[in-house]
Amino acid sequence: MTGGDDRAREAPVPLKTWIAVGGALLGAFLAVLNIQITNTALPYIEGGIATGGVYGTWISTAYLIGEIIVVPLTDYLSQVFSVRRYLLVNTALFLLFSVMCGQAHNLSEMILYRVLQGFTGGVLIPLAFTIILSMLPPSKHAIGLAGFSITATFAPAIGPTIGGYLNDAYGWPWVFYVNLAPGVVMLAALWYSLPKTPTRFGLLRRGDWRGIALMAIGLAALQTVLDDGNVDDWFGSPYIVKLSLIAAVALVVFIVLEFFTGEPVVNLRLLARRNFGLGTLGNFLLGFALYASAFLLPQYLAVTQGFDAEQAGEVMAWTGLPQLLVIPLVPLFMKRIDARLLVGVGLVVFSLSCFMNLWLDIDYAAPQLLWPDVVRAVGQAIVMTPLSAIAMVGIAPAEAGAASGLFNMMRNLGGAIGTAAVETFFTKREQFHSFIINAHVSLLQPATRERIADLQQYFLTHGAASTVNPQLLSGNLQQYAMAQGAAGVAGVWHEAVIAVGNTIRAQATIMGYADCFALLGVVLVAAILPIALLRKGTGAGGAAH
């Protein structure tokens, strides 16, 4: 019997099922959105709860710790409590903790509520993936996975836009309150559509609690290292060294134990399957570039162009909105084109958008970023759906939950590592370029002296901020100083030197960002290799067989 005959006999998908899928996808979208939307308003949140500096970064870190721990646990806990109960309760708690975050008065409260928000919101991501694979027939998996790709790629891109607008228009608490309206719609949709299944509390007695504890400790320590490492000079800090050792020991022991446990909390054996293992590696590298690029662009605009949160968000929208046009077409492409080829094309296009930013300069702002952002949007939109589909080929329905948790955790982990990597890479490359430029700019060089002289004349005409001994000036400037008094030529030489130094730093900063985009382009090109080694599947339907 042919696949076409199977599809012809397949019963139509009930409306109730589509409502369940839509509600689950809305939840996954909110969970991913809450990573980027908060980062945009972070300086304002820090001011609102009277904190800042290195401590303020814990507002983001806390959410990520909760999320990265619960994602791989979701399959096990949904079996214990049933998908319906587990999803509904966590959705309600996610909304509650969102409100509590908006009401937080100090950093301690905010960290607590953000951990709990991440722990409940993280459930929404893998369960949306599981519901697609378990409730939709194989022929409709591509459509469901296309919807899921919107949550995975569109949400990080549009998050800064929404966060910037809400913060500037209504204040920082609204970056948390925005979850309420769609969250209530999601609750109603899932309450109506998800089937009731029995609980299995007996699984708690047989639970792999040793593995759960090791995984939670290891992932929490690793996430903290990734978020704080650059600020604390990585292994130059005893704090980072200790956390790294804890993460390494806990995760290594966890991995070893999971292979020898009869009922592991995370089924790592799935990674031995060619398509799932290679697909998960590709997903990890995609997450690396996806989240790192979403981090880099607003940073570049803020640091080099002086953009505020709303202005940076408007530029990021160019990366998000085109995806809404492309993603619905991807299931149609998958019917006619090998999924591996689609993923490869998407990765090439995504990498091209990164390489387009190699020519950054001081005038490279919103208009110049339009086409790289649009190209990036197209690449991201093409990649996610076929990658998810072909990675799930050979995964049985009973394994869908375990595969979903592992697959999505690796993308999130890739994003955390990618963001930390580009932060550190930028710091090192900025220092490198600053050193090289300074080595070629000397006060003994005629061009440098001429530039400083021009700047001195400019500051004499327009005024300068600091004071300087007029004896330090030269030629006509010194005579002018003697005639007018030191106050008349306040600080012109120092102002000129500072201006030259600022130009050097600005150029080194821009070159550092360009190098980061080059790094992401190389990572995306490298991601093509595991994709090329995948076996050809039967499309999204392969996940069900």
What name fits each language-model region?
Residues 147-149, 155-160, 164, 293, ...:
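Small-residue-rich alpha-helical segments with characteristic i,i+4
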Residues 133-136, 191-196, 226, 255-260, ...:
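Structural signal for the C-terminal ends of transmembrane alpha-helices
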Residues 52, 274, 278, 288, ...:
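Loop-to-transmembrane-helix entry motif
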Residues 176-191, 215-218, 243-250, 515-532:
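Symmetry-related core transmembrane helices of the 12-TM Major Facilitator Superfamily/SLC fold
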Residues 117, 121-150:
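Cytoplasmic helix-loop-helix junction between adjacent transmembrane helices
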Residues 180-222, 229, 234-242, 265-272, ...:
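Central mid-sequence intracellular linker of multi-pass
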Residues 15-79, 84-93, 98, 102, ...:
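Transmembrane core module of solute transporters
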Residues 1-28, 32, 275, 454-545:
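Transmembrane-helix exit segments and adjacent C-terminal regions of multi-pass membrane proteins
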